[in-house]
Amino acid sequence: MTDKPKLHILLCAPRGFCAGVVRAIDAVEQALRLYGAPVYVRHEIVHNKFVVEGLKAKGAIFVEELDEVPDTDKPVIFSAHGVPKSIPAEAQSRNIFAIDATCPLVTKVHREAELHHNNGRQVLLVGHAGHPEVVGTLGQLPEGSILLVQTPGEIETLQVKDEKNLAYVTQTTLSVDDTRNMVEALTKRFPEIIGPHREDICYATTNRQEAVKRIAPIVDALLVVGSSNSSNSQRLREVAERSGCKLARLVLRADDVEWDLFSNISSLGITAGASAPEVLVEEIMAAFAERFELEVETVSTADEGVFFPLPRELRQAAS
């Protein structure tokens, strides 16, 4: 007999790593295998401190700007979030061996923005100021060519060059519902604005939010495993709250769980952001198993079979 209280855990599926994150992490690990340590990485390769520390232990050196990289023949890898065009240009001017691990779905947004600009349209970017992905997208075109909009209120007062010659793109890790509201506000204010042929919100962001929406109303609490600087992880927590979960928390490790808040629950949802490894979910599950008698159920809302090949330089070097 056990004197532990019972806890019904609902595991969201899909959760955790997406194809772009797997590609970026694999790029660093493959570069370390091919070229040896150190390998330099501009910005956190993905927004997860556990992943970054693990790569540091293998010989990766993380920098924020290229001026922190010494003259070297070792590769410098650009993170999954993408970079402004000035960064590859700076790397080329210094003869730096650069490997671009930008997620292909982010690159798609870059190319859309360029295409609209080349066709004479002013580009609006829906996103969060300061996020590396937004910085990278803004930096694809000459300064001032893209207008960043963050709220429907900003759209109401937005000054554009020509209301009949506009296009929009979006950050890939936003809330699906928030983005839908932004697009509705854009099309209401600017009826002739052109959008992407397919949604810019990435498949993994959409799928993880849909899984949270499914279980959030029926659990006492929900944990999102991820780093505080991860946009898609923060959006999962917000989606849980908006979907009716009264207690939603973002945690990186089991040590981050505020156990007093969870002492009287009988059901718990668990998901993980697209940059959070499954080992952290397992760690948190084990910590709950020490305190509760667990009954675990997986709630699946989508099947993911997406794969992105490594950057060309790494594929060629390995062949």
UniProtKB/Swiss-Prot annotation:
Q: Which residues bind [4Fe-4S] cluster?
A: C18, C103, C202
**Cofactor list:** [4Fe-4S] cluster
Binding sites annotated in the UniProt record for (2E)-4-hydroxy-3-methylbut-2-enyl diphosphate: H47, H81, H131, T172, S230, S231, N232, S275
Q: Where does dimethylallyl diphosphate bind?
A: H47, H81, H131, S230, S231, N232, S275
Any matching Pfam family: LYTB
Query: Recorded E.C. number(s)?
Result: 1.17.7.4
Give the reaction(s) catalysed: isopentenyl diphosphate + 2 oxidized [2Fe-2S]-[ferredoxin] + H2O = (2E)-4-hydroxy-3-methylbut-2-enyl diphosphate + 2 reduced [2Fe-2S]-[ferredoxin] + 2 H(+); dimethylallyl diphosphate + 2 oxidized [2Fe-2S]-[ferredoxin] + H2O = (2E)-4-hydroxy-3-methylbut-2-enyl diphosphate + 2 reduced [2Fe-2S]-[ferredoxin] + 2 H(+)
Instruction: List GO molecular-function terms, semicolon-separated.
Output: 4 iron, 4 sulfur cluster binding; 4-hydroxy-3-methylbut-2-enyl diphosphate reductase activity; metal ion binding
| Sorted UniProt keywords | 4Fe-4S, Iron, Iron-sulfur, Isoprene biosynthesis, Metal-binding, Oxidoreductase
What protein name is recorded for this chain? 4-hydroxy-3-methylbut-2-enyl diphosphate reductase
What phylogenetic lineage does the species belong to? Bacteria, Pseudomonadati, Pseudomonadota, Alphaproteobacteria, Hyphomicrobiales
